[in-house]
Amino acid sequence: MGRKFEVRKLSMAKTAGAKIKVYSKYGKEIYVCAKNGSLDPDSNLSLKRLIEKAKKDQVPSHVIEKAIDKAKGGAGEEFATARYEWFGPRYCMVIVDCLTDNNNRTFMDVRQAFVKNHAKIGGPGTVGHMFEHQAVFQFAGDDEDMVLENLMMEDVDVSDIECEDGIITVYAPHTEFFKVKNALAATMPDVAFDVEEISFVPQTMTEISGDDVAAFEKFLDVLNDCDDVQNIYHNAEIAE
């Protein structure tokens, strides 16, 4: 498919303030996931995947446990999901997923981030059809044919496999996340995943270069500073 997957490394947060924001985002998402489903990760696969992702991003165990305990109590804040599909700098396509207890506040915060950075507001479905909801796995390797054969032997549905610079990327329907992960682990016992997540993967890329790079990075920073923003997906590709 020729797509490039951008790794968003929350674990790269360097300052205490940045780490607190990461912990807060995970805590909120884990709380909502546990409250809306089973508290047992073995029967709530969305919660299981989220906990594994949080641990990979070095979220302390006490943050995870506190979020689950809060959900166990039954009471607490009520959060709703909100998704915004807009055009960012250079008309790159952007999807912003939020968890909010005040839709008006969240919309205004996200809108302000776009307007201040000369981005364009779209409506539902404006850019979503240009992304695919995929399970994504990345790990070191150079034999994508072997990986594909292994997955086919395990009867796993795969959308695409890419190999670039010694890194293999496997794309699969998001519903196949654990099936793919278990199949890869079973056929390659020593595999170490650099990425294992469900994401919106763009079908096409928009190149960002020159002065637009700094503007785009500032735009992402402003969005990430919004308390209700959980995930940002885009099709921008920074020119090397």
From Swiss-Prot:
GO terms assigned for molecular function: DNA binding
Keywords, in A-Z order: Cytoplasm, DNA-binding, Transcription, Transcription regulation
Gene Ontology CC: cytosol
Subcellular location: Cytoplasm
Matches recorded under InterPro entries: Integrase-like_N, TACO1_YebC-like_2nd/3rd_dom, TACO1_YebC_N, Transcrip_reg_TACO1-like, Transcrip_reg_TACO1-like_dom3, YebC-like
GO biological process, one term: regulation of DNA-templated transcription
Pfam families to which the protein is assigned, alphabetical: TACO1_YebC_N (PF20772), Transcrip_reg (PF01709)
Source taxon at top rank: Bacteria
PANTHER family with a match to the protein in the record: TRANSLATIONAL ACTIVATOR OF CYTOCHROME C OXIDASE 1
Family per record: Belongs to the TACO1 family.
Entry protein name: Probable transcriptional regulatory protein PBPRB1582
Species per Swiss-Prot/TrEMBL record: Photobacterium profundum (strain SS9)
